[in-house]
Curated annotation (Swiss-Prot):
Residues 1-20 form the signal peptide. It comes from Notemigonus crysoleucas. This is Ependymin. It is found in: Secreted. Keywords: Calcium, Disulfide bond, Glycoprotein, Secreted, Signal. Its main location: secreted.
Amino acid sequence: MHTVKLLCVVFSCLCAVAWASSHRQPCHSPPLTSGTMKVVSTGGHDLASGEFSYDSKASKFRFVEDTHANKTSHMDVLIHFEEGTLYEIDSKNESCKKETLQFRKHLMEIPPDATHESEIYMGSPTVIEQGLRVRVWHGKLPELHAHYSLSTTSCGCLPVSGSFYGKKKDLLFSFFGVEPEVDDPQAFVPPAYCEGVSFEEAPDDHSFFDLFHD
């Protein structure tokens, strides 16, 4: 939390300039971020909740679902977006599934063609520490016949919430306790038992959003 406050102080001048701008370019995530991510369907069904780590420079993402969730299996995925590789990891049985990922956009980073929609306060804009200024971005994903929105902090570009509306599913993302750091850099390294595993075929529109379903 102290680190996030420091980021806001450092970038306060930039934020003030951006506030007055009528046309904003998508901001960039910090080099490293981590926290809790929760995904639900628009019907209110809990789909996933767990800890995420994201390396924006290397474009790598790790998500480990909470084991106390009322589910028979728990998601542990590692995605190397630039390489187009998705690992589904089973650490208990030391097994690994590897798939190609042709569609590489996701909600951990604002796509470069996103449109700035608004800048708003969540909570109070006048009471100290009782409000959060966020920027709302939106855009289309024509390859998936879908559109999305993403809210980030005005200072620091940390994820706050997001939504995905497609032909097959609608998803809502929430991010909590986000910090501009990752405790374990090995989170982005596939386990040794993933070495030598052959790629499994996946459709051309296979994406980050396919991970979350009932």
